[in-house]
Amino acid sequence: MKNYAQHVKEKLLESIQSLVSLKEMFVMHRDKDFTRNRKLSFETLIKQILEMEGNTLAHELRHYFSFSLNMPTVSAFVQRRALISPDAFLYLFHTFNFAIPFENLFEGYRLIACDGTDLNIARNPEDKENYFQSNPDEKGFNLLHLNALYDLCSKRYLDTLIQPGHKENEFRAICQMADRFPYSGKTIFIADRGYESYNVFAHIERKGVNYLIRVKDKDSNGILGAIQFPETDTFDVDVHKCLTRKQTKEVKAHPEKYHFLPKNSTFDFLDLHTNPFYNMDFRVVRLKISEDLYECIIT
């Protein structure tokens, strides 16, 4: 194969051309936006935004247009950029990913890591969903929360979900990304303790993929704290649980079989009438990783 970096670049440019051919679907006013030939065409804007390095807009424009005296103004760029729907970049993201095969696997499996992080954005006290202020007399800041799926073997992002800073919910984010996961083949979702949830397990299972999630230890207030395990330091056991919101005599008499979920515990596949029970089977492994330190995973 030709130089891999050049191959990837060609696929990106092909994906951009595919987007340009459908630009009417990704503008705010399809009957008039980008219908005339101007310096800041739809294609030029897409490429320039992808090439930006985090400098000021004035600096980015000078660099992109090679310090031309006829380059567009910052105001013109902002106005033209506002005509492009965010869905344009979502389309480009997925089209580009699909254009390059997933050839790097781990023993036949695609390994998908899920995690989240805060992103600092421009300070704006009027942006209530994203503005944080520790004390009334202190200068505040703005944050977004980025959730992402990352292919560990291919070293590329497969999906992202951005949430307002004050509405961060990593449980909901991984469920949404699992629901819309478009790739076929053997796959394992991998996540840390912040994703320990029956609802997360169920969403991933129902997508037909596997998961491996680090969880709190057996003596904690987490999922394992409500399950009986062997009196050994390490173990590898299969667990069956029937989840329910009912509190019948049967449920109370058999805690080894049933797990009661209160109303404030999110689970999207239960209700008291049509779906009162939900069966789950999973494997719990407790590993010794140092002299006095253990880790637990559910898979």
Give short role names for the model-derived ranges.
Residues 110-112:
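Conserved beta-strand elements of the Class I
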Residues 57, 70:
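Flexible coil/turn residues that form the inter-helical turn or adjacent wing/linker of helix-turn-helix
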Residues 88-100:
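Short Lys/Arg-enriched helix C-cap and helix-to-coil transition segments
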Residues 132:
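Extracytosolic and intramembrane catalytic regions of membrane-associated proteins
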Residues 1-55, 63, 77-84, 91-92, ...:
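Single, function-defining residue in the core of a domain
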Residues 60-67:
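Short alpha-helical "recognition helix" segments of helix-turn-helix
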